[in-house]
């Protein structure tokens, strides 16, 4: 069968977006892995699925699958692209959209020239909300790594789990070495996204993220939210912060006790069709 799809990206964090309202398809783990292959498939960080909602207050259901085929709760760059996709495909004429995710409801607002502002919901910090194994809540935790190495982390759930550590320079940070250890650390029973943040000043940070089930990506929207919130909680950052990632910049806003707002661009790369039989087992 022919499957229609759209390739999009948010700051280089790239997606294959599939409308399963207007067409039907079964995409299992192995099929998703083959589609994600950058040499033999479409190639993407995440697969985004548009489905009818299960709850009356939502316009759409938004499902996210990593390149390894694992389903995750949230993707910030993805939800911006999702909002643009459903609007451009005329699945809705709304510019303020209510979207159901595994992590709850998010509310993207379409702006001009592909920019989207998203209400990302409330950040969570308690160990059982991450989830993270700890005897009691603390401002910072020490994580033991290989070769007697320790790092200090903050933990934040932005719909998916994040560990944030501050580094002197993101360019020299050992993301490739430390990232996989943090991602699969035994204290994170559902694994975690590992963020490495450099504070430039109180309104500007640089960030690299080693994403759960993907590896390092050019940008991570929920990672930017988690890093900014972590810095704000530590008293290092103002309530509105520019987060600079390899793929570009996001603006993150947060007040204690309120929801997190993320604003950033989206890019529609191309539309395509493929014969799904070639990617199924």
From Swiss-Prot:
Important for dimerization, annotated site positions: 270
Active site: 75 (proton donor), 220 (proton acceptor)
Enzyme class label: isomerase
SUPFAM superfamilies, per database record: Diaminopimelate epimerase-like
Localisation per UniProt entry: Cytoplasm
Cytoplasm in keyword set: yes
Keyword Iron-sulfur: no
Record-listed E.C. numbers: 5.1.1.7
GO BP, one annotated term: lysine biosynthetic process via diaminopimelate
Keywords: Amino-acid biosynthesis, Cytoplasm, Isomerase, Lysine biosynthesis
Superkingdom, natural source: Bacteria
Catalytic activity: (2S,6S)-2,6-diaminopimelate = meso-2,6-diaminopimelate
InterPro entries: DAP_epimerase_AS, DAP_epimerase_DapF
A Gene Ontology term for the protein's cellular component: cytosol
Positions that bind substrate: 13, 46, 66, 76-77, 160, 193, 211-212, 221-222
Pathway annotation: Amino-acid biosynthesis; L-lysine biosynthesis via DAP pathway; DL-2,6-diaminopimelate from LL-2,6-diaminopimelate: step 1/1
Site location (Could be important to modulate the pK values of the two catalytic cysteine residues): 162, 211
Gene3D superfamilies: Diaminopimelate Epimerase, Chain A, domain 1
Function: Catalyzes the stereoinversion of LL-2,6-diaminopimelate (L,L-DAP) to meso-diaminopimelate (meso-DAP), a precursor of L-lysine and an essential component of the bacterial peptidoglycan.
NCBIfam families tied to this protein: DapF (TIGR00652)
Family: Belongs to the diaminopimelate epimerase family.
HAMAP family per UniProt: DAP_epimerase
SUBUNIT field: Homodimer.
UniProt protein name: Diaminopimelate epimerase
Species: Acinetobacter baumannii (strain AB307-0294)
């Amino acid at each position: 069968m022919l499957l229609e799809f759209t390739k999009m990206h948010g700051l280089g964090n790239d997606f294959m977006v599939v409308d399963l309202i207007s067409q039907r398809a079964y995409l299992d783990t192995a099929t998703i892995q083959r589609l994600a292959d950058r040499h033999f498939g479409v190639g993407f960080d995440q697969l985004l699925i548009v489905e009818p909602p299960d709850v009356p207050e939502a316009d759409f259901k938004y499902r996210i699958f990593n390149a390894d085929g694992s389903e995750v709760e949230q993707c910030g760059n993805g939800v911006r692209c999702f909002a643009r996709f459903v609007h451009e495909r005329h699945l809705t004429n709304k510019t303020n959209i209510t979207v159901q995710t595994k992590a709850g409801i998010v509310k993207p607002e379409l702006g001009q020239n592909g920019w989207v502002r998203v209400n990302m919901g409330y950040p969570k910090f308690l160990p059982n909300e991450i989830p993270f194994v700890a005897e009691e809540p603390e401002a910072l935790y020490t994580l033991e790594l290989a070769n007697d190495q320790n790092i200090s982390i903050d933990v934040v759930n932005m719909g998916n789990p994040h560990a944030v550590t501050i580094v002197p320079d993101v360019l020299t940070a050992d993301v490739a070495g430390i990232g996989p250890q943090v991602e699969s650390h035994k204290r994170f029973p559902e694994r975690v996204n590992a963020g490495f943040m450099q504070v430039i000043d109180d309104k500007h940070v640089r960030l690299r993220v080693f994403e759960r089930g993907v590896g390092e990506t050019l940008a991570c929207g929920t990672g930017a939210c988690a890093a900014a919130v972590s810095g704000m909680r530590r008293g290092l950052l103002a309530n509105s912060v520019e987060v600079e990632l390899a793929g570009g910049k996001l603006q993150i806003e947060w007040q204690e006790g309120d929801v997190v707002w993320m604003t950033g661009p989206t890019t529609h790369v191309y539309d395509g069709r493929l014969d799904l039989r070639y990617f199924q087992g």
